[in-house]
Structure formats: structure tokens, C-alpha cells
Amino acid sequence: MESDENTNSYTTEEDAEYAVLLDRREQLTDLLAESPYNLIHYLQRAVVHSNLGYPDLAAGDAYRALLLTDEVRNEGFEYHDQAVDALEPYSSSPSALPEVLRHGALQQGSGDMVNGHGPQGPESYQEIAAVASVRCYQIISLSLLLCGCLSSAHTYCERGLAASPHNQELLNTRSHILTVGRGRLQTQDVDVGRLPEWGHVRREVYPWNHHEPDRFSGKSLSFLNRELASMAPKCEVRVSELPVLLDSASNTDDYEIIPTCHQLGVFAKEDIAPGETVLNEYSLLTANNRLKDQLCDACGTELPPLSAGAGPVSCDDCQDTVFCDQFCHDKAQELYHPAVCEKDVDAIAKDPDAAESSASLHLLLLARLLAMSVHQEVHPLQLTNVKYIWGDFIPPRTNAISVSPNAGPPPDWTLPFSFKYNVETPLHILEKMDIDIYQTLPQHDLWVLNTCLAKFRGTASARQSIRDGRPDVAAVHPFWCLANHDCNPNVTWEWGGRMRLWARERKVVGDQPGGIKAGEEILNHYCDTDLPVQKRREWAEGSLGGWCMCKRCRDEIAQNGLDGSATNGVNGAAPDGVDGVDGTDAVDGMDGVDDSSTEPMDWAPHSKKKDVVMTDSDVLLRD
């Protein structure tokens, strides 16, 4: 396929190179399955990932290699013997380093390494480990720079320079980090403590991801409808035709015919009366970022008082883990808790700073999913909790970086990424769970974790604390998120241990009677429907992956112009808390949620002001 000025697709020549790189990646992944403690294979795969245009995956591989250099250099470490044995094929000739280490000045060996970072003994594997550690720092720091994670990039660059102060590649990378930092901080005098930590990476179904189902197939729809029957007996999952989302304001708002795409949706099989429950969904894929808070570990609801008849129920083996009732206790023991019982993971990512509340919840949702996967012995992406969720993925070719001189601008990568929250801490959690992060690479490779996080960001709802307004409890309800968004919804929702959808008593637009007729689609809402159209679109952009193109939004834009900020389109009034009412703007720091987060929060408020959608629902595709 030829590229042109408006695409980032590969040229025919690049297609061939891309195919070779994908084949090499597969070979190295197979080699890692055979020799999971081989740090050289990790570095080789990091280089391939970098050449494929996945700097985040390159950083993840180099980090695992860096951990293995520590295993080699320290006899008391858990995997020392395995890591040393894996280097045996490279140790026959002390003067010959593996090709991946002969990079720039590193081909001269460890001669300029200082501060105790050189070889820890005369063995040839010690020389390899010492040189490899610097190569790891090179790859990690440059890759994180390319992801936009300047703070971590600077940290690992400085660690590399502490070991090899004159390494030119590290010196160049540090210079580039500071240059980019000046642009992002808009100052010539860069305070490295203020360098941003969050960047963005590719959000896609990776070419080697064979776990993603055909969501529109008869088999998938049959499974989903069997599961849905007990939660929403009057509904069914079907394929829905939806407007394609745009990235910004467009004159297509007033077109009668607009581009559409297909996604899953929920439809009424029977008439549903106003106020009638549409869906009642229970989920164990929950997270709580408050340490020792009085919440059920399983469903996230508040614990009943000790005097209650059923009362809270504790785990017999770890008394600190408490459930709201016997049902939640039994479900937790069946589906996830034994994987974390007495494993000292409770305090990780708890009681975060305000700026990290959102990130901690996404991380803890990932931790819960990993516990489910480990206990059930099922690959994380095969768990039904996430398998059929769409993660607002963008086709790999759209994400591709073309080297053609006629190529357009670089693509906009859309998955928020932090080295701490996407790489370091997930691996730390797995180690706390007594999981061998090398042997279980197929289940816990970084691309797997990224895919899970993309799906969470597409479906998670959260509850704000009544104490400080921060999000402190989150959950993924995979069937609730199948109900597509509309700014004139026919249902509303509340989450309190279970996610409940019910038919609205009155419609938002025109104050028409509520209720849903058989055959009509269930239309959910991921933003405050009282907001004017521009505010709604800004809120829902994080939830939907683009600007809402529902009929109400397009009608109001056509009526009010592209800014669409005059009224809420329902009664002509500015809603409470908007445009300076009460001295605040509803979009900034929503109801006490700290808006200074360095991680993109992308949360949309529920009308009850305590439940929020965390981001990117299973809805419309970006144009």
C-alpha cells in the first residue's frame, strides 16, 4: 500500500521491512518462552519494538533486562542462577560482546564505568551484565522520551550517566529531554522536578494480539446475550449503527447524512415502563484507593455496621480483608482473592496524592484483573470481564510512523502512559503476588497490560469521596458499558455495589414521557446532560474518544453555532455551575476532583454528582 501526504501508512518498501520486523519479534518472543531469563533476548526485542514504532514496549523490555542484570550481578537474588545460565552461550569468548551490546562506545566494554557499576567479578557474565545495564538505560531513557514521559526518562538517563558518565548516547538523550522539557514547561530554565511524567502511546489491537474476539460474530453475540439474560431480561445485545466521532468542531454537524460505523449496543426486546429497571449488573472488577477504608473488597459498597444481622464477613486467612456479606465473600474466594491473600499488596497505590487518584484507580483495576487471571488460570485478555470490551483502538497503520519524505505529521497516540503506572508498579504487584514475571511473560507482557488499561479507560465508572471529592472507588461493568451514549438518553444510572440502569421518567429534550419501546436502543449517558453542548462535548470527549455526534448535539450546534456554549438546549438556561455561576466553572475540577492531575483524567460526571464515568466507553470510533 502506497502512503500519501495525508496518511501514516507504510509504503510498499516499508511494508516489507515491517513484515521482517514482525517476524523477528515473533522469533524473539518464542526464544523468551524457551529462555525466559535471557536478558540479551529482551534487549534484542526492545530494539525490534523500537524499530516497529513501539517505544513503550521497548522500554518495558529494557526494564525487564535491567532487572535481570541485577539478578546476574547479585548471587543472593532469586533468579541469579537462571539469569547466569541464560548468558552461558555468550560467555565462551570473553572479548566478544553480543551484537546488541556493541552499540557506540559500549563496544569498548565496561572500561569507563564508575561508582561500583562495573563488573562485580572476573567472570565473563559479569562483564556482560555491566555493559548490558548501560544499554538498558540507553533504551529506557530514549524510549520514554519518545513516549513523552520526561520525568522517568530523565531519571533513567541520570542513572545511566552515574554508571557511565561519558556515554555519548546518554548525554545526547539528556540534552533532548531538556529541550523537549523547555517546550512543554514553556521555560528556558527547566526544573527537572517539574518534568511531566505522563505521555501517550499507541492504542491498538497489536498485530500479534490473537485474543481479541470478533465481537460482531454470531458466537460472540450468543455468549453476550446468554450472560445478559440474568441482568437485563428485557434486553439483548445487537450490532448498532452509530455516528463516527470527530476530533473537533466541524461543519458536518448540520449534514443530514453523516458517516457511521458499527458497534455493539443494547436493545429492548419488550416495552420497558418509565422508572422500570433495565439492567442490574454485579461486578468484582473493582478498585478502592483508600487504605483500610470501610468498603467491601469485592463490590466496593460501604460495609454494613457490625450490629447488622448479616454483618461484614472477613477472610479467614487475612482478617484485614472484609466483605459486605457472605455472597461477596464467596464470590471473591471463588474468583480472585486467594491470589492476593496475605501477599502484602493491600498498601500499593493506596491513599495517593490528589494528582494521582485517577492513575491509582486504573492501576488497582489492573491489579484486580491480574489476581482474577492468576487464580482462575486464564489469560487476562480471555477473562469475560474484559474480553468483549472495545478499548477505543485505532488501526495499527493509523498509528504507524512513516519515514517517507512525503509523510504527513506524526500520528496522535491516544493511550495515556506512565512508566511508573504502566510498567514498574504492575510488575511490582506481580512480584508481591509471588508471580515469576519472566516465566509468565505471555500473560504479563507490557502489550497485554496496555490492552487491559485501554479497555478500562473505555468502561470504568468511579465514585467520588464525600470527604474530599476525589475519585476513590472504581469498577468495570462490561454490560453496562455496552449501552451507547446519547445526550438525550432514555435511561439513567447509579452504582452502589451493583450497577443499575432504569428507564427515565421524562426525556431530557422536550420533557416527553419516558419509557422504552420494544426494538429501541438503550441510550446511556456519560456526561451531565444539563450542560450546554460545547461543555458536554468537552466532557464526553474523554469518555467517547471524540466529539459526541448525537442528534441533540448536532441540532444544538446548528442552532447556536460552533461554540455551542449559550444554553443547555433543553430550556435555554445556563445550567448550575456553568459559565461562572457560583464562582466556578463546571468543567474545571469537577465537584472537588483535583484538576491538576498530571495524568489525563478524562472523567465525565453523572447527573447525581457522585458517580462518574472514567473514560472512553464502548461506543463510537474516531474518524
Residues of each region from the PLM?
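Short alpha-helical interaction motifs and adjacent low-complexity tails used for partner binding
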Residues: 1-623
